[in-house]
Amino acid sequence: MELGSSDVTSSGLDHAGLNSLGLPKPPALTRVVVAMSGGVDSSVVAALLKREGYEVIGVTLQLYDHGEAVHRKGACCAGQDIQDARQVADQLGIPHYVLDYEERFRRKVIDPFAQSYATGETPIPCVSCNSEIKFADLFETAQHLGADVLATGHYVSSKAEADGGRALYRSLDSSRDQSYFLFATTNAQLELLRFPLGDLAKPDVRQMARQLGLVVADKADSQDICFVPSGKYSDVIERLSPGAVVPGEILHVDGRVLGRHSGVIHYTIGQRRGLGLGAVGAGAGEPLYVIRLDAAKAQVIVGPRQALATRRVHLRGVNWIGPGSLQDMDEHGLEIFVQVRSTRAPIPGFLHAHESEIWVDFALDEDGVSPGQACVFYENDQPRARVLGGGFISATESALQMREMFPKPPNEDLLDTNESSDLVSPKRSAC
């Protein structure tokens, strides 16, 4: 049940005896910890819950050395954001705590991000931040505070199912849906999580903030990865893993050496501009894209756009939160919809599981696939679709037969493009 439901009586309970958070007691007896980032969304969540009579406690996480990020727009969990969260809490008259999670954030999020990027992957730190920090460590803190539930400002929904558990769903506002970043949420975590904004559109939330008089009502939305103040991921990698930056060759998929690079961390799979190759190519005016990054050999492999097409992805770290279990899957696979980039809509595909191997076959060619990114499973491609889980892409298989494109390649090893890509650097959506 969503906040403000017309089924809720004056007592704060619906006709089934549940409050708007699905708990069997009045709001005044329900303690809710709200993860307050200092942004509009989580501030509105805290304000709405307070207005409905819940006992609200605000908690803000200090996740990194935020000194250089104070007053910097487009980030979260920075110095100014902590001040904004505190100011909103003061407005609402609720307790507010700031927790220093810098060490664990570096250990669980920043260091793995740097290691993954150095291997030629395109990692998503927001997934591990949610699953390892917000929905794990913060959970423990919420329980220590005696909270009944933990509420966040994510644009997703969770609903009670007939079997007594809770399921995760995409938000009503597809343009703001954040379920891609929450696929690693476990069933146990869903039991205690609440997402009050799941059935609201962002313009409505911002209008609510203005009506509530919140000081952050017109604050800009977060866009960047919070711990990359300059917006350059390579700066973080060079600082944390200086030995990982090794110069090498830029090769065409047909084996020709086209130039040299100063480190694979400066390239993104699917990148077209800034390759430093001038007008070279297999043919006159042929656009070249980064097809594969081989960090072990310090090679950047480029080729035509057609080489980016992918039909199969192999997965690691799979989390299943759908009905039943993966072990019960039919040998022909499960027909689902999958999302391989945060900025694209889900596409049809088939999920397969055999022994320890899990993979997805796309029904259509997909160009925007990069190892390290997530492949998230959905029941359908509509708003409010149920999230079935997901995993991290470990490798992909090309939709093209490379040997047909290049019948006599000088170096067949280069054509084994088991890591495919995106046409442009994947946009980093806020998590």
Swiss-Prot record:
Q: Tell me the PANTHER family matching this sequence.
A: MITOCHONDRIAL TRNA-SPECIFIC 2-THIOURIDYLASE 1, TRNA 5-METHYLAMINOMETHYL-2-THIOURIDYLATE -METHYLTRANSFERASE
Q: Which residues cross the membrane?
A: none
What is this protein's name? tRNA-specific 2-thiouridylase MnmA
Q: What is the lineage of its organism?
A: Bacteria, Pseudomonadati, Pseudomonadota, Alphaproteobacteria, Hyphomicrobiales
Question: Which key words tag this protein in UniProt?
Answer: ATP-binding, Cytoplasm, Disulfide bond, Nucleotide-binding, RNA-binding, Transferase, tRNA processing, tRNA-binding
Q: Native species of this protein?
A: Beijerinckia indica subsp. indica (strain ATCC 9039 / DSM 1715 / NCIMB 8712)
Q: Where is this region: Interaction with tRNA?
A: 176-178
Disordered: annotated segments:
407-431
Question: Which cysteine pairs are joined by S-S bonds?
Answer: C129-C226
